[in-house]
Amino acid sequence: MNSSLTAQRRGSDAELGPWVMAARSKDAAPSQRDGLLPVKVEEDSPGSWEPNYPAASPDPETSRLHFRQLRYQEVAGPEEALSRLRELCRRWLRPELLSKEQILELLVLEQFLTILPEELQAWVREHCPESGEEAVAVVRALQRALDGTSSQGMVTFEDTAVSLTWEEWERLDPARRDFCRESAQKDSGSTVPPSLESRVENKELIPMQQILEEAEPQGQLQEAFQGKRPLFSKCGSTHEDRVEKQSGDPLPLKLENSPEAEGLNSISDVNKNGSIEGEDSKNNELQNSARCSNLVLCQHIPKAERPTDSEEHGNKCKQSFHMVTWHVLKPHKSDSGDSFHHSSLFETQRQLHEERPYKCGNCGKSFKQRSDLFRHQRIHTGEKPYGCQECGKSFSQSAALTKHQRTHTGEKPYTCLKCGERFRQNSHLNRHQSTHSRDKHFKCEECGETCHISNLFRHQRLHKGERPYKCEECEKSFKQRSDLFKHHRIHTGEKPYGCSVCGKRFNQSATLIKHQRIHTGEKPYKCLECGERFRQSTHLIRHQRIHQNKVLSAGRGGSRL
């Protein structure tokens, strides 16, 4: 019976796909899938269903689920089946947006999550990794939280169990419930009291005090509660069981009892709400940190490291949504040798926040997410995949393209609350708001000009003659960093600014603007003496010398007379 149940679970999990297993209870009956999968199930025929595709383009994850769940019976023929699969796969992998390497990473990540043991899958998917390296970091962090080592090739579940909620027990078919009872009686002699099981069938919330009282005649069940074991366990592994992290074999469902686990001092330690007094605030923190999953890891203190009865145990009990789960904090050693309790859940999240597994091979800068690394690498490669359809200008980031498009649309979403003036970019608004705060303005002692503190040091370089930005190629120095970037294009030959009319390219935007006046005929520079107009300021300056020479010639002639 054990092998048949395991084979049945493997077959159903393989059909549903790896990501669906994280959203549903792993041991729910097939008739309960309709509440967890994005499909439409007919009541009279549980085996037949039609995908409920939205009218608008679904997100990639929804398309991936539809791609994995499509059945040949749902389509009219082989041509439609092949066409539907191609469409769903394209919506999922988005080849028009993602590179080949990114698409390959998505496929590898999906397969990596598939081969993980089910207990690790629930934890890894809770953190929603975006790449294989991020999933590996989650597994490593969990491994360190469980046994304090990161180099071992095995994950030990000797002190770990996954709790089963009352609703999940209620949804189990009779065959699986019988299997639970048989496994429990075989391994530890524990039995479920008939009164307790009937209360579960009636969907009633059972106080912890009453559970212990009803289970007291059996003895072993009360011992299980005192040993901080969950009432029902999906893990099902004994204290000697070790599961290789590469093996994805599901473990049989059974009741678990541990006579070696240390219990509470008395039943009176549990209050009326089924929780240990003084631990309510800690329970709320732990419940929020595990918001994405009902699969809660229960760690038990090893026998050699257990505190005495007079010491504070640090046990937690949580009873919510018809679920009773025990959490015992694992002791750790500080640098000074003092023992303390620390939640492995919080420790794992702290490690994940500190780690930056994605490192740039060019400059060594590290990032938390792979997508941030991809965006950063465009600085080195010069890739600019986002192009403006109006003028053809390209950008390395979509946010920069959005800002640029406002120059064509005239949109100014940022408004000053003091004067009502609107701006296209947030940086322009911040610069403008500094004009309202006079206390942040300073006066230059050299020329008397008043400017903001952020521009004061830049302004003072004009008087001091400082040029802190130096080119490594020709050793030419500049006052501003932006001028150095523009100068670098002379050595690299980069010409990012192209004319949309003739295709000619330039290394500076100002040069492109001057060139475009040839096509538009614009002449913005006007001579105040004769009214003649010019395209460039240099042409106007050259023209003004003609008037200056005439004035000088007239002055010389008058002096002779």
From Swiss-Prot:
GO terms for biological process: regulation of transcription by RNA polymerase II. SUPFAM superfamilies: beta-beta-alpha zinc fingers, KRAB domain (Kruppel-associated box), Retrovirus capsid dimerization domain-like. Keywords: DNA-binding, Isopeptide bond, Metal-binding, Nucleus, Phosphoprotein, Repeat, Transcription, Transcription regulation, Ubl conjugation, Zinc, Zinc-finger. The keyword Transcription applies. A zinc finger (C2H2-type) spans 358-380, 386-408, 414-436, 442-463, 469-491, 497-519, 525-547. It comes from the Eukaryota. Residues 64-146 form the SCAN box domain. Residues 1-61, 182-201, 231-285 are annotated as: Disordered. One of its GO terms (cellular component) is nucleus. It is found in: Nucleus. SMART domains: KRAB, SCAN, ZnF_C2H2. GO terms for molecular function: DNA-binding transcription factor activity, RNA polymerase II-specific; RNA polymerase II cis-regulatory region sequence-specific DNA binding; zinc ion binding. Its main location: nucleus. This is Zinc finger protein 394. The lineage of its organism: Eukaryota, Metazoa, Chordata, Craniata, Vertebrata. The gene is ZNF394.
